[in-house]
């Protein structure tokens, strides 16, 4: 009887996982097929017997400034990744290894900042950037990206740094190493998994974002992929839905490859950074 119940439970679990996989992969498969489908109709009762083509991809590269959008987005994502890594690692190292007055209060303030959704501050962000003259600039957009992700990232990386034994620091100091040497040659190499996670998250944020670029950027030559593709499809309504599917697929491919290539580091970094030994 127990074996029967165990088998039934296993079947139920597999059915549940299969249903979830279909819910996740279904829209992806549909988008991939739609991007190769002849015609402009994204919706179809069936994909059987439908002719496929590469015309949508040709039109995307020939009729739109897609490479310009790609370049702008890549610049923003890369700049945000580099700046975030530098600021987050230095801040986390200071909070993890140094003792100073107000440290606890600062950490609690950072923790409280994580509780407020970014959408609550959209109006304040726009007014602030307008006063600073940063509307329609990449500097303004990067300012929002970097400062918005700092609270969560600092706490996460600090937790990982805390798990690195301080005895390594002390041994290095005995050998004559300074604080920066300890940071660069001991802490950072041991923190590679969490740094990969932070870098990837910092890169994918601007790459996939639509709301903030729409709020801040105004010039067509500064458009990102999300804004450019949306503007292109909305200009001719339903005529460009299959082209939109092709563009969306090309946006997702680099991120998917990055996640697959760094999956091991992401899992290790996230779990280790969340638990202090």
At which residue positions do the language-model features occur?
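A structural signal for multi-pass alpha-helical bundles of membrane permease subunits
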Residues: 2-277
């Amino acid at each position: 009887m127990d074996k029967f119940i165990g088998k039934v439970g296993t079947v139920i679990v597999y059915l549940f996982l299969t249903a979830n996989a279909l819910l996740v992969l279904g829209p992806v498969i549909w988008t991939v097929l739609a991007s190769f489908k002849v015609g402009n109709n994204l919706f179809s009762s069936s994909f059987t017997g439908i002719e496929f083509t590469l015309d949508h991809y040709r039109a995307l590269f020939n009729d739109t400034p897609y490479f310009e959008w790609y370049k702008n987005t890549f610049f923003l994502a890369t700049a945000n990744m580099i700046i975030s890594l530098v600021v987050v690692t230095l801040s986390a190292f200071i909070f993890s290894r140094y003792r100073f007055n107000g440290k606890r209060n600062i950490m609690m303030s950072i923790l409280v900042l994580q509780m407020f959704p970014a959408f609550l501050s959209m109006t304040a962000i726009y007014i602030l950037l307008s006063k600073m003259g940063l509307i329609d600039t990449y500097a303004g957009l990067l300012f929002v990206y970097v400062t918005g992700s700092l609270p969560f990232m600092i706490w996460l990386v600090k937790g990982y740094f805390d798990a690195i034994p301080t005895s390594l620091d002390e041994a290095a100091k005995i050998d004559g190493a300074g604080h920066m040497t300890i940071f660069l040659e001991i802490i950072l190499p041991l923190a590679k998994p969490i740094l990969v996670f932070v870098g990837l998250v910092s890169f994918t944020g601007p790459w996939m974002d639509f709301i903030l670029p729409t709020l801040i950027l105004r010039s067509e030559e500064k458009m990102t992929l999300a804004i450019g593709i949306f503007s292109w499809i909305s200009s001719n309504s339903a005529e460009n839905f299959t082209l939109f599917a092709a563009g969306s697929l090309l946006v997702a491919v680099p991120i998917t490859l990055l996640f697959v290539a760094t999956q091991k580091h992401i899992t290790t970094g996230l779990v280790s950074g969340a638990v202090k030994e």
